């Protein structure tokens, strides 16, 4: 008669033998389950006990199978049954919600609105008047819509100068004629304004007399009917004289004289602006306190009205301090909105400074280990666009720019955010394989 063994007897045989698995072993036999005692009917207590013993038996089988090297995914206690969740009722309508525009209590002061350019109704000859400023919140916020969109003025120079190739190819045939250059900027590149830079007046360049430089201003005024900004050469000794003479020949046109600063005779420039009906660009170098000081002197010492002052806090290009320029402009705008009346003026950016960054115009990196910079024909305009757009978000109102593509893209983005043009849907589903 075959010997009877319990499963526990088999597993106990290997206790203390450090056996992890049995290979090549076959166990033959019959399994006998004694259900004696069921008697005359179903006993729930007995059924529960039988179920428990069956579970123990299953655990023994699982342990035994594991010893033979067979993977087992069960053997733990049975999980309690989970009642099916009640189905949520199907929504017929979306939960109602209302968007309330925030009322920021700290923003109590409106930015001064400044007009540039006089039409015939104002005593000038411009075909339109440009308005900048007037904001009651940071740009493009729902809190208070911008009353005036961003404006772009494209640079013109009174002599042929060295320009990045990507820029020069757009102007090469007109660079010897400031009037034709200005006309091309307006008619072909959709400039809102023109900035004429009288750089030949610098004593270290051509030392052009102020009276002769003023003729260039007259030429530009006759060539286009948009408002203009008049810039000097940056020479602190010569600029006050040059700008005063330019202001005289442009009397009544309400030009923007660029610029008054703390390192030159700002009082002479302010005097010319008041005498000949012009605005003043108040220029400082990334210093909020210096900006306050210059604005205060223009208002208190020189009696320049608030609606004739535009600030230029200086634009540092992408990669060359853009974060400083952005932070400075944003701090100025926030302080103005919160009531600092020495800073409540629109701002202008020399976005053209982006072309001073070598990454905008060089063919490639001078470092052999650098990755490819990509074609400069795209890279340069993108450099100018990113510089301008960053400062637009910080609160800048007026942009002095050069490349026509940069001008077009910046105007499209800012005017879309402003709400004056509708954005066109763009298919971005193929962005991985898209070619530029």
Swiss-Prot record:
Transmembrane segments: none annotated. Pathway: One-carbon metabolism; methanogenesis from acetate. The gene is cdhD1. Keywords: Methanogenesis. It comes from the Archaea. It holds the Pfam family CdhD. InterPro entries: Ac-CoA_synth_d_su_TIM-brl, ACDS_complex_subunit, CO_DH/Ac-CoA_synth_dsu, Dihydropteroate_synth-like_sf. Belongs to the CdhD family. This is Acetyl-CoA decarbonylase/synthase complex subunit delta 1. One of its GO terms (biological process) is methanogenesis, from acetate. Heterodimer of delta and gamma chains. The ACDS complex is made up of alpha, epsilon, beta, gamma and delta chains with a probable stoichiometry of (alpha(2)epsilon(2))(4)-beta(8)-(gamma(1)delta(1))(8) (Potential). GO terms for molecular function: anaerobic carbon-monoxide dehydrogenase activity. Signal peptide: none annotated. It comes from Methanosarcina thermophila. Part of a complex that catalyzes the reversible cleavage of acetyl-CoA, allowing growth on acetate as sole source of carbon and energy. Probably maintains the overall quaternary structure of the ACDS complex. The keyword Iron does not apply.
């Amino acid at each position: 008669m075959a010997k009877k063994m319990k499963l526990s007897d088999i597993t106990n045989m290997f206790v203390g033998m450090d056996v992890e698995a049995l290979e090549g072993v076959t166990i033959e036999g019959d399994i006998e389950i004694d259900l004696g005692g069921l008697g005359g009917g179903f006993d729930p207590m007995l059924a529960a006990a039988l179920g428990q013993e069956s579970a123990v038996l299953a655990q023994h089988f699982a342990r035994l199978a594991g010893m033979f090297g067979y993977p087992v995914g069960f053997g733990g206690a049975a999980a309690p049954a989970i009642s099916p969740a009640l189905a949520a009722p199907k929504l017929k309508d979306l939960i109602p919600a209302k968007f309330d525009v925030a009322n920021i209590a700290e923003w109590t002061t409106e930015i001064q609105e400044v007009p540039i350019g006089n039409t015939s109704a104002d005593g000038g000859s411009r075909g339109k008047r440009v308005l900048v400023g007037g904001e009651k919140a940071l740009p493009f916020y729902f809190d208070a819509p911008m009353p005036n969109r961003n404006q772009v003025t494209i640079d013109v120079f009174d002599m042929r100068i060295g320009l990045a190739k990507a820029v020069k190819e757009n102007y090469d045939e007109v660079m010897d004629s400031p009037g034709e250059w200005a006309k091309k900027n307006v008619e072909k590149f959709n400039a809102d304004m023109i900035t004429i830079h009288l750089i030949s007046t610098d004593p270290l360049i051509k030392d052009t007399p102020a009276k002769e430089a003023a003729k260039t201003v007259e030429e530009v005024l006759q060539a286009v009917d948009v408002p203009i900004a008049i810039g000097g050469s940056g020479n602190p000794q010569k600029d006050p004289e040059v700008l005063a003479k330019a202001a005289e020949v442009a009397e009544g046109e309400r030009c923007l004289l660029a610029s008054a600063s703390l390192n030159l005779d700002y009082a002479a420039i302010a005097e010319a602006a008041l005498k000949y009906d012009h605005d003043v660009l108040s220029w400082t170098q990334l210093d909020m306190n210096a900006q306050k000081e210059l604005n205060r002197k223009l208002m208190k010492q020189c009696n320049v009205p608030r609606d004739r002052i535009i600030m230029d806090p200086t634009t540092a290009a992408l990669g060359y301090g853009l974060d400083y320029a952005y932070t400075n402009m944003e701090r100025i705008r926030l302080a103005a909105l919160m009531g600092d009346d020495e800073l409540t003026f629109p701002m202008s950016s020399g976005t053209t400074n982006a072309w001073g960054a070598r990454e905008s115009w060089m063919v490639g990196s001078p470092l052999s280990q650098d990755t490819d910079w990509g074609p400069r024909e795209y890279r340069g305009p993108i450099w100018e666009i990113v510089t301008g757009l960053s400062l637009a978000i910080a609160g800048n109102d007026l942009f002095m720019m050069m490349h026509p593509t940069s001008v077009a893209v910046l105007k499209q983005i800012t005017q879309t955010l402003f709400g004056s043009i509708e954005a066109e849907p763009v298919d971005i589903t193929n962005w991985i394989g898209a070619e530029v």
